[in-house]
């Protein structure tokens, strides 16, 4: 497959990130490597979206701290970004609404085709009037040819950085003006862009808990967007999926990363990290990056059992 015929993917991870661990970052890296090896996908970006403060989880530190820790954790990555949108809303947002927000935002700022899992490739280009004999539209009439794949990916990458990139320390993070003029308007007919939910097997397993998830949301998350699962602790993902009628229904939309099931980062968790911090356990350096540890110590986070 050529670059233009492969599905271009943005991986979106929602969660507490309380704190963000090396395991979270490795989850992105492992998912990207796996998708690339299939030959069907090109991962062009990753988004870390920390949950709103009103989520109500015991021991959840302020989103201000979590956003800064997340940014410190990805500061050396050239493709993973932190997005504060979820934290800045008036109240907690569902995973479904976060996915829909990013899909709609990327439609507006890139002009790319953003499709659902089952959308055929003839999907109309969002944001362009559909008329017979429609020609590519440019603000600069001197542009002689349609944009190349490289130009398109550059535009998407630029937009993704503007949307997601936040830098501590600031009182309030700045992200993209959704009404901003991003320059040349092009019809990106060649590129199909999809946002996939990235998660661990623990989140996948939570879909099987009766009443925990809204079934309509599950239909959208799994049926429309799709999921990339990075198993933890050698979890049996086939067994998990067989326990949910919706997961069984959309099994083909769930991609399980099958690499090293004994990957050392697969046992790392935020809970283990907090416990290590509370007990002064030196193994915390195996769980968290040094900039995150330094920030935690400086801010005196997670120093007692309540979080």
Curated annotation (Swiss-Prot):
Reactions catalysed according to its record: beta-nicotinamide D-ribonucleotide + ATP + H(+) = diphosphate + NAD(+); nicotinate beta-D-ribonucleotide + ATP + H(+) = deamido-NAD(+) + diphosphate
Any Pfam family hit: CTP_transf_like
UniProt GO cellular component terms: axon; cytoplasmic vesicle membrane; cytosol; extrinsic component of membrane; Golgi apparatus; Golgi membrane; late endosome; synapse
Cofactor(s) listed in the protein's UniProt record: Mg(2+)
Effect of inactivating the gene: Perinatal lethality. Mice show a greatly distended bladder, underdeveloped diaphragm and a reduction in total skeletal muscle mass. Defects are caused by defects in innervation of major organs and tissues. Mice lacking both Sarm1 and Nmnat2 are viable and survive: Sarm1 deficiency corrects axon outgrowth in mice lacking Nmnat2, independently of NMNAT metabolites, preventing perinatal lethality.
Membrane topology (UniProt): Lipid-anchor
Annotated phenotype, changing residue 167 to A: Impaired membrane association in neurons
Gene3D superfamilies, sorted: HUPs
Tissue-level expression: Expressed predominantly in the brain and nervous system.
A biological process term (GO) from this entry: negative regulation of cytoplasmic translation
Keywords attached to this entry: ATP-binding, Cell projection, Cytoplasm, Cytoplasmic vesicle, Golgi apparatus, Lipoprotein, Membrane, NAD, Nucleotide-binding, Nucleotidyltransferase, Palmitate, Pyridine nucleotide biosynthesis, Transferase, Ubl conjugation
Effect caused by changing residue 172 to A: Impaired membrane association in neurons
Positions contributing to ATP binding: 24, 271-274
Stated regulation of activity: Inhibited by P1-(adenosine-5')-P3-(nicotinamide-riboside-5')-triphosphate (Np3AD) and P1-(adenosine-5')-P4-(nicotinamide-riboside-5')-tetraphosphate (Np4AD).
InterPro entries tied to this protein: Cyt_trans-like, Euk_NMN_adenylyltrnsfrase, NMNAT_euk, Rossmann-like_a/b/a_fold
Location in the cell: Golgi apparatus membrane; Cytoplasmic vesicle membrane; Cytoplasm; Cell projection, Axon
Domain of life of the native organism: Eukaryota
Entry's EC annotation: 2.7.7.1, 2.7.7.18
GO molecular-function terms, A-Z: ATP binding; nicotinamide-nucleotide adenylyltransferase activity; nicotinate-nucleotide adenylyltransferase activity; protein ADP-ribosyltransferase-substrate adaptor activity
Purpose of the protein: Nicotinamide/nicotinate-nucleotide adenylyltransferase that acts as an axon maintenance factor. Axon survival factor required for the maintenance of healthy axons: acts by delaying Wallerian axon degeneration, an evolutionarily conserved process that drives the loss of damaged axons. Catalyzes the formation of NAD(+) from nicotinamide mononucleotide (NMN) and ATP. Can also use the deamidated form; nicotinic acid mononucleotide (NaMN) as substrate but with a lower efficiency. Cannot use triazofurin monophosphate (TrMP) as substrate. Also catalyzes the reverse reaction, i.e.
Family affiliation: Belongs to the eukaryotic NMN adenylyltransferase family.
Subunit structure: Monomer.
Designated name of the protein: Nicotinamide/nicotinic acid mononucleotide adenylyltransferase 2
Source species of the chain: Mus musculus
Gene that this sequence comes from: Nmnat2
């Amino acid at each position: 497959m050529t670059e233009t015929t492969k599905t271009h993917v943005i991986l979106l991870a929602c969660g507490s990130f309380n704190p963000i661990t090396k395991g979270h970052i490795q989850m992105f890296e492992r998912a990207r490597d796996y998708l690339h090896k299939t030959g069907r996908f090109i991962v062009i970006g990753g988004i870390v979206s920390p949950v709103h403060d009103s989520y109500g989880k015991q021991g959840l530190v302020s989103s201000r701290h979590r956003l800064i820790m997340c940014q410190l954790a990805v500061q050396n990555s050239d493709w993973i970004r932190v997005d504060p949108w979820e934290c800045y809303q008036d109240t907690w947002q569902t995973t479904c609404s976060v996915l829909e927000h990013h899909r709609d935002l990327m439609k507006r700022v890139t002009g790319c085709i953003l499709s659902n899992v089952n959308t055929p490739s003839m999907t109309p280009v969002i944001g362009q009037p559909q008329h017979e004999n429609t020609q590519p539209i440019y603000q600069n009439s001197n542009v002689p040819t349609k944009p190349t794949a490289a130009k398109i990916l550059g535009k998407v990458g630029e937009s993704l950085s503007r949307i997601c990139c936040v830098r501590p320390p600031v009182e309030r993070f700045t992200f993209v003006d959704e009404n901003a003029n991003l320059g040349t308007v092009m019809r990106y007919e060649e590129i199909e862009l999809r946002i996939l939910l990235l998660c661990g097997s623990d989140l996948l397993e939570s879909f099987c808990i009766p009443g925990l998830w809204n079934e309509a949301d599950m239909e959208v998350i799994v049926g429309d967007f799709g999921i990339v699962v990075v198993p933890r602790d050698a979890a049996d993902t086939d067994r998990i999926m067989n326990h949910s009628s919706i997961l069984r229904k959309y099994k083909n939309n769930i991609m399980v990363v099958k690499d090293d099931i004994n990957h050392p980062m697969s046992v790392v968790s935020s809970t283990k990290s907090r416990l290590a911090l509370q007990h002064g356990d030196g193994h915390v350096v195996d769980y968290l990056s040094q900039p995150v540890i330094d920030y935690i110590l400086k801010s005196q986070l997670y120093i007692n059992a309540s979080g």
